[in-house]
Amino acid sequence: GNPPDGAPNGQPGGFGGSGEVTQGTSANTISEDTTVTGTAYTSTGDDENALRVDGAAVTLDGITVDKRAGATSNTEDGDFYGMNAALLATNGATVTIKNAAVNSSAQNGNGVFSYGSGTTVNISDSTITTSADNSGGIQTTGGGTTNAENLTVTTSGNSSAAIRSDRGGGTVNVTGGSYTSNGYNSPAVYSTAAITVKNAKLTANNSESLVIEGKNSIALENCTVSGNMSSTKGSSSSENVHTVMIYQSMSGDADVGTSEFSMTGGSLIGKNGDLFYITNTHCILTLSGVTLKNEDPDGYLLRVVGNSASHGWGTAGSNGAQVEFTADAQTLEGNILVDTISALDLTLENGSSFTGTIDIVDNAEGG
């Protein structure tokens, strides 16, 4: 079904999904085990992949994939199942991609899409560029797996996370590379999956940098992360402005449960609003040796609160957050806000320090 209005980052799509796996057509399909070198694949058709690998073990070296035109008739099918993506791996395929260039200028044309349990994409030393709305860089759904190493991923459209997941989640492992989003509602990482990123640069130039939805996770090691959410143009800017958002949307795209965020080493820079915003979920938050910087003097280090429910995130007055926050060899500076329907358990260990205040405020909805 459709997400609540204003689900951040537009990750769940609109127009009403078909409710069944609908992947459209493909200009080129590989369904037998093979190795391909230096081939160019293009698509200009609606609901059409430029290249689909269906159920086969395939190695692709030095290929180019260009989704030049053609829109989806249904953005949920594009977001959930890979319809209209430039390159789609599906039906238990194992795809190894090296030295590739993948480009998409099509609406809802995700770059490299891994769909379904048993499907694995291994991609390295490649570039992925998308320019239209609802077009993530690497997208993983339905229990698929993506392993990415040394990629340069750039997205320019709105609702186009560089590392993106959606209904059914999966597993994403990223090592090295740079991931940059330039649109609104387009974090560097949007997680409805188990996502691990090591030694990468994650930059959201007009959005929050990281989002976890529901019973899912992001684990970062030695990453350089920055976010710059718009105060007005984000789909949830009226609710809060922040750099990291952890929430439960109730759209059905992520199971309800504990969200987990961990960051070891590296840096996290927020240019607007709060550094961390957590609402309508239970969260385990762990920071270890991270350089934190909030460039907004009015922004909180951490905001743990309910929300207005105007976007469908639970019921106003009872949609607070419960956060277990462990700081390990970590310097924390800044204020923390917790409302009366939320709870924070803060543990400082291994020489950690906290300089700031913890402000307890009434829930805005009277909960």
PLM segments and residue spans:
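Surface-exposed intrinsically disordered loops and tails
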Residues: G70-T72, S238, A309-G312, E365
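Beta-strand-rich solenoid/repeat architectures in extracellular/passenger domains
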Residues: G17-G19, E32-D47, V58-G82, A93-N108, ...
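Disordered, low-complexity segments in secreted/periplasmic proteins that are enriched in proline
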Residues: G1-Q23, M250-G252, G312-W313, G366
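Extracellular beta-solenoid/beta-roll
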Residues: N294-D296, G312-G367
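Short consensus segments that form the blades of beta-propeller domains
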Residues: T75-G78, D253, W313-T315
